[in-house]
Amino acid sequence: MRDEAQCVIIGGGAMGTGLLYHLAHEGWTDTLLVEKGELTSGSTWHAAGLIPHFIGSLNMAKVHLDATNLYKALEAETGLSPGWHGCGAVRLAVNAEQAEWYRYVQGVLELIGIESHLIGPDEIRELAPLIEDTSDVVLGFHTLHDGWADPTGTTNAMAAGARQLGATIARHTLVTDVNPLPDGRWEVVTDKGRIVADHVVNAAGHYGPQVGAMVGLDVPIVSMIHQYLITESLPAMAACEHEMPVVRDPRSSCYYRREIDSLLVGPYERADAVTYGTDGIDWDLHFHLTPPDHDVLMPWRELAAERIPVFGEAGIKQTISGPITHTPDGGFLMGPAPGLRNYWMCVGASIGITQGPGAGKYLAQWMVHGQTEVNVREMAPRRFGPWATLGYTIDKSIDEYHEMYQVRMPGEYRPAGRPMRMTPIYDRLDALGAQWQDVWGWERPRYYGEPEDYSWRRSNAHDIVAAECTGVRERVGIADLTAFAKFEVTGTDAAALLGRLSANRLPTRDGGTRLVHMLTDLGGIECEMTVTRLADDRFYLNSAIAGTTHDHDWLVQHVLPGEDVSVADCTDGTAILAVTGPRARDVLTACTDADLSCDAFPWLTAREIHVAGVPVTAMRVSYVGELGWELHHPIDRMPDLYDALVAAGEPHGMVHFGSYAMNAMRIEKAYKAWGGELTTEITPIEAGLDRFVDLDTPGRDFIGRDATLVRRDAAGTDLTGLDMVLVYCEVDATDSDCRGNEPTYDPADDSSEAMGITTGGAWGHTVGKSLAFAYVDPAFREPGSTFEIALFGGRHTATVLAEAAHDPSNERLRA
């Protein structure tokens, strides 16, 4: 066996071979895949092979589409059939909430050209004649061009395609250890010898946690036992002249598909799901199945038999029962592993036949080019942190399995595995009626009041949030913002590091605060942070909590050899309380001797002071666009500071506000957000970040500068050289507002082809308007331009705004 490679992939299932195939097509043919048994011999071989197009995430929909596109073409390329059955699929909606969700999903799929139709019970029975009971069916979501494939055939065909280009595969080769080498490369130790590689990829399926443990990683994956049943041959199936589409049924929590002349039924039981191998899985297992458990399936089998009576009468020819990987949020892990250089993850898919090709495509782009053509935030391993313990992973993964075919409503944060991390004032806020969400393990208030009746339209929280916004805008509000990432960058070369990374100039005076964006080599927006200079060798950085590990790695991994720089993650030890609104100064003055006047403490500055006897870094910034301060302080002193602020705020009518109100008010101010408007496949030119990108200071360079200049020149002064640009708009919505991923249209185009997408929106309670951000054709960039947005099947007019709907001149921030 060879002893060196550019890249070693550990694991020969759908995910590993999907990556091998795409790396080879990207030119990385010096790649070796090692598999301890035969290809597919872990979980891949016993999968049902379903490949759905129905999914509510735009970027995951692109992953799924990549699979169907590839499987249709693989045989012509490789001579091996992937066993593709393009029979389409129908997902049943059995209540109004599901029907609303399906209308939203239809808009998402339309953006990338996936054809779908909403059909009635009669057409459902015509497509799938074995289904007789449709008494509870509101509608069906019919995707015409997906279906299913043979797991072994797809994997072997991708492997053959990679081999044709020069990639290699070593079967029956067990990895026993992985070690970092002093030169930055990796040593992969196997039972057949040692391999040194520039890159290593963990694609080990349900062995992923054990392979990750070799390098000190806790991989948040557990395996769930999944079973499916195959009936004896059915005369009714044999008589069906077409291959019925795959049917997914939320009532029975089952999928149904044809298997020759039999029916294959796969329940995702909604109770008593069983994990597998949480203490480790025997390395010697190959093509392993577990004993069937028909009792746990019986309630769901009975519901399936009500839907399809011939199933209840049929004999069961075979029961397949085996482990399938799951993660706490149901998504796979694809991208750089936290804290490590050139160690990558491509693992954890619960529908790997669907996701292997797309995951491989985008990870190959990431490895070769440094970024991807889609937003991979929801796939990245660093979306989890050390808080994602084994217990948490088990609880959440079981819940995800139980809810596989159920609707996740807007605002719904399921209780499984929670709470994990709470601030010291959790009980105080809970007593006030805080309705919680979990964000990167932290509990954060959404709003304060009665529990939310979840809805795709405006919910009962709408009026409650309106009162919170009014309280902040007219008086003063307090919010727990602890769930943000915080870093200290220190050392004589700290400014040099941050200057190389930041598209904007750094603050030049102690106490200065700037918003900066950090770019990829290709100009994509990698990070967004506020940078506060506390001294010439000491900087304090804040960013979105979801970027904690991502942003820390970005900073640390760009320190040059020999530089005097230290990057400390102080997120867990630092709490943040925000006091904001026109009376914020009055509240704080009652708690501190510091001079808070505008002359002494202007907007976008910070000072280290004491408030109520607590040492704080007070930053005069406000994400809601009002006079205000963020008070960053030791987390163990949070109760003291909070109690003092609440007491001082009582005479001023202080309100507590949560993330719902904050989002509504930031959109009124036209503030863009990382992960929504700002992502790696977008450059500052499309996003309209001109004033935050310094391209003109002589001699100043930063990562992504050259690519940004090229992009700016290609765009032209009228931006017509771009495919799309970000606009801020008012929408004539009635009872619902944009959430993101709604398609946008040119009203003069009769083709009904979507031209762009929204990234988020909200009702502006202060201005009385429904507001949104959207990427559209540059022809619609000018203020006053109108286009259309699809909301739940209806078209709504959007009008481009020239400036923020609330306080565009920032007078309130500067007060």
Residues of each region from the PLM?
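Dinucleotide-binding Rossmann-like beta1-alpha1 core, especially the glycine-rich loop
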Residues: 49-127, 251-256, 260-266, 398-410, ...
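Glycine-rich FAD pyrophosphate-binding loop
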Residues: 24-45
